[in-house]
Amino acid sequence: MLKFIQNNREITALLAVLLLFVLPGFLDRQYLSVQTLTMVYSSAQILILLAMGATLVMLTRNIDVSVGSITGMCAVLLGMLLNAGYSLPVACVATLLLGLLAGFFNGVLVAWLKIPAIVATLGTLGLYRGIMLLWTGGKWIEGLPAELKQLSAPLLLGVSAIGWLTIILVAFMAWLLAKTAFGRSFYATGDNLQGARQLGVRTEAIRIVAFSLNGCMAALAGIVFASQIGFIPNQTGTGLEMKAIAACVLGGISLLGGSGAIIGAVLGAWFLTQIDSVLVLLRIPAWWNDFIAGLVLLAVLVFDGRLRCALELNLRRQKYARFMTPPPSVKPASSGKKREAA
């Protein structure tokens, strides 16, 4: 049972999402509707994109805490270009390139300069946030064109164009990691770095690619953010890095690298977003959101740690069972046989 849970964390995350959807339905029947699903999905798109990028980095046994700042910086660039008269496609491409470049820089710091990921990205967190504030002068960017907002308008089955793009990206990333040698290189790099090198995996390049794609996903999240609310505050992206990491952990992505799946991270992002909608339904003040999300994450981390210890103990028992089995006892001869011998 323990091994099944460990190897199928996506199923447990899915069950948690379903329970969080069904249980509030007993309080309000209107909550059990397609409209609720589309609303939660629309709210979860930013976190889903960030969780997908964070998954790639965490699979390589690294962590990136700068994605919130990358999201804010890229959203600011998008707003500045649009207000300067550039077309939406040009502004979006430039925004994605900036995110890719920011992620690439993180990857270079970690893979080539050998700076620990948490230290490197803590530094770039402040760097990218500072660039964002220098560009805006601490002011909000408003007056964004209506065509940007159309990206988040319902298009088909109540899902926007960006929503469908996110679904396509999830499917593509799941296929890439599960079915291709390139995708399996991320797992190999995080599971055993030296072993992956001996197998011919270019581990430095894989880590740089992971950070670069993570930055690109953060840039796309910035585009989604700007299109959904129609303006860009000076604190855009603050705290999103922690939510992205939490979503991955909730979905079964190991902090030790080498295990997990994209679909688990997506379900973790959905779960965290759905908590907010349930709190609204229960009329709980919004300032409880982070507390409850943190409490849930802490519970999952404790459960994950205890589960890992139990599995390791069970594995050791199986490994040494044949050495611990006592030899069969020798039965004494019966008294009748003794008399015959006499």
UniProtKB/Swiss-Prot annotation:
Q: Which residues cross the membrane?
A: 14-34, 39-59, 70-90, 93-113, 115-135, 155-175, 213-233, 252-272, 284-304
Q: How does it assemble?
A: The complex is composed of two ATP-binding proteins (LsrA), two transmembrane proteins (LsrC and LsrD) and a solute-binding protein (LsrB).
- Alphabetical UniProt keywords: Cell inner membrane, Cell membrane, Membrane, Transmembrane, Transmembrane helix, Transport
The source's domain of life comes to Bacteria
GO MF term (any one): transmembrane transporter activity
- Native organism is Escherichia coli O157:H7
Protein name per Swiss-Prot or TrEMBL? Autoinducer 2 import system permease protein LsrC
Is Disulfide bond among the key words of this record?
Answer: no
Which segments does the topology annotation call Periplasmic?
1-13, 60-69, 114, 176-212, 273-283
Q: How does it sit in the membrane?
A: Multi-pass membrane protein
